[in-house]
Structures are given as C-alpha cells and as structure tokens.
C-alpha cells in the first residue's frame, strides 16, 4: 500500500498532463484564443503542450521523476500567474491550484526519499 499510493499519484499526474498537452497541441476549442488573450505569442500552445508531454513522460521513471515534477511545477506556476493576472474565474483557477497541489505533494514525497516504484 505504501508504494501503491505514490505510484497511482504519479500515474494520475502523468495522465492529466498527457491530456492537457494533447489538448494544447491540438489547439481545440478556445485554446489558441485563450493563449492569445493571455498575451502569449502565436504557437505558444504548441510549446506548452510539448513541455507538458515531456514532463508527463519524465514522471514515469523513478530516475527522472524529480525533473518531471520540476518542469511541470514551473509550467503550473506560469499557468496560475497567467490565470490570476487576467482575472480568470474560479472555475479555471480551482483545477490549476488542485493540480499544483498534487505536484507539490508528489515533490515533497520524492525529496523526502520516498521509494516511488517505476510504473510498468
């Protein structure tokens, strides 16, 4: 049970960022318009989506997990700053803060030396 919870947390975070990365890369819905409204240059959704996919992949191996958490933490910090700066509604802020909180929890566990089993 001790290894199962961290493994499930890493898998869940990886899935969240795979989906987010795919949505950002696809530019579906209002993605491109949102990035433009937040002041990012054209095509930044591709950069962000690509980095989210890289971060998700890094979470899947115990040897790269720290770097995945660091990369995704920076991405989420930037996302939260953009959302706050543009006074986005709570319905956009709440998921961002929840995901950032899960990333922080995972990072604390990794830095404390928790043995996160590699996903297989």
Residue locations for each model-derived region?
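Membrane-interface extramembranous regions
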Residues: 1-120
